[in-house]
């Protein structure tokens, strides 16, 4: 029986989850909710179901796998990863994954805060100014390794791919000084399951943020 992934009909916090489901060849179906247009941004499609799904902490995204009903995007990623041995093999690797998971979320939220801000045009130059330092940290951590935890891919690579790709869309030249990060993105996109998914009709990554965002909300 396929698992169900529920989220808005955007890229958002579900992109890394979709990629991991595809990579692990997990049978899944999506429940996509549509948000209304400005000025009200009607969310009734989701709100009408929010408290009827048996979720402990109702939110989007959610994953339902039989009796397991999970919210929080990183909890969903970890759940899928545990089933496929993608959570690191040593304590040192697991420590690194914990750090990277939270670092990636920080970077994601920092970009989102700028893109949802009414002062977007004012805040964007300041964010771009600090972006090389952010990318440098990821580049130095990755070094010459294929994946962020070493030679074997883990769930964190899906998170970091998503975050780096968002920034590549936001600032197309932001990775030019970091060839190992560009190689990482190409390596990830070259994985057969990922490549096949990206060529399929199921794949959509155009709209990153919800409709109330100033940047990339269409």
Swiss-Prot record:
Domain GST N-terminal: 2-88
Catalytic activity: RX + glutathione = an S-substituted glutathione + a halide anion + H(+)
Summary of subunit composition and partner proteins: Homodimer.
Source organism superkingdom: Eukaryota
GO molecular function: glutathione transferase activity; identical protein binding
BP terms from Gene Ontology: glutathione metabolic process
Database matches in Pfam families: GST_C, GST_N
Protein name: Glutathione S-transferase
EC primary class: transferase
Keyword Transferase listed: yes
Residues that hold glutathione according to the record: 7-8, 46-50, 59-60, 72-73
Residue stretches making up the GST C-terminal domain: 90-208
One CC-aspect GO term: mitochondrion
Provenance organism: Mesocricetus auratus
Task performed by this protein: Conjugation of reduced glutathione to a wide number of exogenous and endogenous hydrophobic electrophiles.
The keyword Transferase belongs to this UniProt entry's keyword annotation: yes
Binding site for substrate: 116
Keyword set, alphabetical order: Cytoplasm, Transferase
Disulfide pairings: none
EC number: 2.5.1.18
